[in-house]
């Protein structure tokens, strides 16, 4: 089966060590588990690993198989296909042999050295905690051997392993492999091959692996890993070797599993291609197809079986706000309407006192309800579902009761000092809370104090009230008719947030004072389906945001002219948190800027051209810049706008899919 190369990194980039160590790949299994590393197969993060499993028991993500030292022995020479960093040195010291990295149905590596040409591919198996690593020997002058050393960590993915006496070092023979049961209460790891291998048990700890990216982030960056032994497999020209690492022994042939998973991914690619066909421009079709393919990695079934969206890889879990902002682009616009409805239906069951969870726990902790806007994004997500073919009967029977409970809870007042004021606007929080999306704290204090009446919360509130009023009429539910309230909110919104002389919206109103910082939150007052602003005011908001906040990779969270602006997202955790929403760029906001830009534009054709060129340039430059084929979470506010945060963020990809589809539906004239 011929595989399509979506992205390629050639030798000119891979030969630059510093550059190559910033290029990362990711493969997922639909359960929240993943495999990930750099293109050099050198782990630079504690989150890297070949089998990072989202376990049911113990709950959470665990790095099981951290690294695989793989090498080819030919004659008297040993050629290493992977590398690692120890204090002051890389191993191996000699030049690496990566000729090309490509991402097609899965990450694929091509190595060349002294007459040897070998291909490696890595693939997680859908709905299994199993990774397959395949080696195809295209050319080998003499018969040789593939030598493999697996290194296990068996720890939570936020932690690091240190050598300890508790790890059980004994291995047990299985069919074409072995199993290791390192700790009581943890699953085993089972390593198997498709061909006979010589197994040499040689249990030993290797100390002081270094993870450079963790050092950059201000965390502990040294780890000890355990190697249970060595596998050696004879190879020659035409050989195919497949390694399986899993929590369960495999009874099927590994070749058949590989073929089945490849066929499944090929079918998914055809489906993605069909959706992208509706776009007129060939480059746009390629970008949308790749975004949809990338977006699929976020759709998971949690260990409890609940359909969910992972907010970002590597370290984010299942976040309510991110889910609701992401799911229209990742489901309804990506040919997965049933999955979208299942996610909404599942989330609805967790409403409590009008609030939907900010975070769904993947361990023993309770779900977190510390949010004001998740419930408001719920209304927007239902609007998007309805816009793109959702079933109104499903909304009435399953979602409408929840929508009414949310509004009632917010109107009457609920947790976190959330209530509707006499002016109809929505109040949220106090000085100790951080319940909007700008929620970073330093030493327990919110960095961006947004309690009171935040502008985007009230834009979302107005949108929700208008939408419920619309549905109330459609469903003949007269209890939820809000014509007078709509007029009151509309007037109060302008009176409270509009800065007449500057023609833009302030960010938050509190204690009689309007914070006039130029932030991107105001763009929602234009982009949402129901705007609380007269159309004449849209241009002012859009132009202010464009002038101060628009970058080639998204919107800054604060104007560079503000004294509190932080242009670089770097340093330890406290320093980074202080910059997270104080100038750092977020690409998820591109979609709302684009939507507002189109609504405000007098010349729709010119606006469409501007936005399409913007997206094309962004994707050309970024998709092989950090996470290959992925959209990063954030970027520096200052040029050259380095990517940072998670290498693959759900709402970043989802927003671009949605904006692409919006522009495609907009006539050129």
Question: Residue spans of the language-model regions?
Answer:
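Conserved oxyanion/phosphate-binding beta-strand-loop segments in alpha/beta enzyme cores
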Residues: 268-313, 342, 346, 560-564
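Catalytic cores of carbohydrate-active enzymes
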Residues: 358, 411, 415-423, 427, ...
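Terminal accessory carbohydrate-recognition/targeting modules of carbohydrate-active enzymes
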Residues: 1-280, 314, 321, 332, ...
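Solvent-exposed loop and edge beta-strand segments that line ligand/cofactor-binding
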Residues: 226-231, 306-323, 362-375, 439, ...
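Aromatic-rich carbohydrate-recognition surfaces in CAZymes
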Residues: 139-140, 161-164, 182, 235-237, ...
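Active-site-adjacent bridging/hinge elements
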Residues: 209-218, 293-306, 347-357, 431-443, ...
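Extended, well-ordered alpha-helical scaffold segments
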Residues: 257-275, 287-291, 335-349, 392-412, ...
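Non-catalytic C-terminal accessory modules of carbohydrate-active enzymes
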Residues: 79-106, 113-117, 412, 543-553, ...
């Amino acid at each position: 089966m011929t595989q399509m190369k979506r992205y390629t990194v050639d030798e000119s980039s891979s030969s630059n060590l510093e550059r190559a160590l910033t290029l990362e790949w990711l493969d997922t299994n639909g359960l929240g588990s993943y495999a990930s590393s750099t293109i050099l197969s050198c782990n630079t993060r504690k989150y890297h690993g070949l089998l990072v499993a989202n376990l049911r028991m113990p709950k959470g993500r665990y790095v099981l198989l951290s690294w695989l030292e793989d090498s080819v022995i030919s004659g008297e020479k040993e050629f290493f296909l992977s590398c690692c960093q120890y204090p002051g040195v890389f191993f191996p010291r000699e030049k690496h042999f990566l000729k090309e990295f490509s991402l097609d149905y899965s990450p694929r590596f091509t190595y060349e050295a002294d007459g040897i040409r070998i291909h490696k591919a890595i693939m997680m198996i859908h709905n299994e905690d199993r990774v397959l690593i395949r080696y195809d020997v295209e050319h080998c002058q003499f018969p040789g051997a593939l030598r493999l050393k697996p290194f296990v960590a068996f720890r939570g993915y936020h932690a690091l392993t240190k050598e300890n006496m508790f790890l059980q070092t004994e291995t047990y023979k299985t069919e074409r492999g072995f199993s290791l049961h390192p700790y009581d209460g943890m699953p085993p790891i089972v390593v198997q091959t498709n061909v006979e291998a010589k197994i040499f048990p040689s249990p030993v700890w290797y100390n002081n692996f270094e993870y450079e990216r963790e050092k950059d982030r201000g965390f502990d960056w040294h780890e000890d890993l355990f190697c249970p032994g060595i596998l050696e497999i004879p190879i020659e020209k035409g050989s195919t070797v497949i390694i399986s690492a899993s929590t369960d022994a495999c009874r099927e042939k590994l070749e058949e599993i590989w073929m089945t998973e490849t066929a499944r991914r090929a079918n998914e690619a055809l489906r993605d291609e069909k959706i992208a066909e509706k776009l007129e421009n060939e480059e746009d079709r390629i970008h949308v197809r790749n975004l949809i393919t990338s977006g699929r990695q976020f759709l998971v079934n949690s260990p409890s079986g609940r359909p969910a969206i992972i907010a970002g890889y590597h370290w984010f879990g299942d976040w309510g706000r991110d889910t609701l902002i992401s799911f229209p682009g990742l489901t309804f616009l990506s040919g997965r309407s049933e999955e979208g409805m299942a996610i909404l239906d599942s989330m609805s069951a967790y409403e409590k006192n009008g609030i939907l969870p900010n975070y769904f726990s993947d361990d023993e902790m309770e779900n977190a309800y510390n949010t004001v806007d998740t419930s408001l994004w719920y209304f927007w997500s239902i609007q998007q579902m309805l816009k793109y073919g959702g079933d109104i009967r499903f909304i009435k029977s399953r979602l409408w009761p929840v929508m009414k409970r949310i509004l009632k809870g917010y109107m009457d007042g609920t947790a976190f000092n959330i209530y509707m004021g006499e002016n109809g606007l929505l109040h949220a929080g106090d000085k100790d809370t951080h319940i909007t999306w700008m929620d970073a704290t330093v030493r327990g204090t919110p960095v961006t104090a947004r309690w009171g009446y935040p502008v985007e919360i009230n834009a979302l509130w107005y949108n929700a009230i208008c939408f419920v009023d619309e549905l109330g009429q459609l469903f003949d539910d007269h209890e939820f008719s809000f014509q007078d309230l709509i007029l009151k909110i509309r007037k109060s919104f302008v009176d409270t947030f509009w800065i007449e002389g500057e023609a833009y919206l302030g960010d938050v109103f509190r204690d009689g004072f309007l914070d006039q910082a130029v932030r991107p939150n105001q763009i929602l007052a234009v982009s949402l389906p129901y705007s609380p602003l007269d159309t004449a005011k849209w241009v002012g908001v859009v132009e202010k945001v464009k002038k101060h906040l628009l970058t080639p990779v998204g919107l800054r969270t604060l104007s560079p002219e503000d004294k509190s602006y932080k242009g670089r997202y770097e340093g330890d955790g406290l320093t980074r948190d202080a910059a997270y929403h104080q100038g750092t760029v977020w690409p998820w906001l591109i979609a709302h800027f684009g939507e507002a830009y189109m609504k405000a534009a007098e010349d729709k054709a010119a606006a469409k051209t501007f936005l399409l060129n913007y997206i094309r340039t962004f994707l050309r430059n970024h998709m092989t810049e950090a996470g290959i084929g992925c959209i990063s979470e954030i970027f520096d506010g200052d040029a050259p706008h380095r990517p940072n945060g998670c290498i693959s963020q759900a709402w970043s990809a989802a927003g671009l899919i949605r904006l692409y589809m919006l522009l495609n539906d907009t006539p050129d004239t």
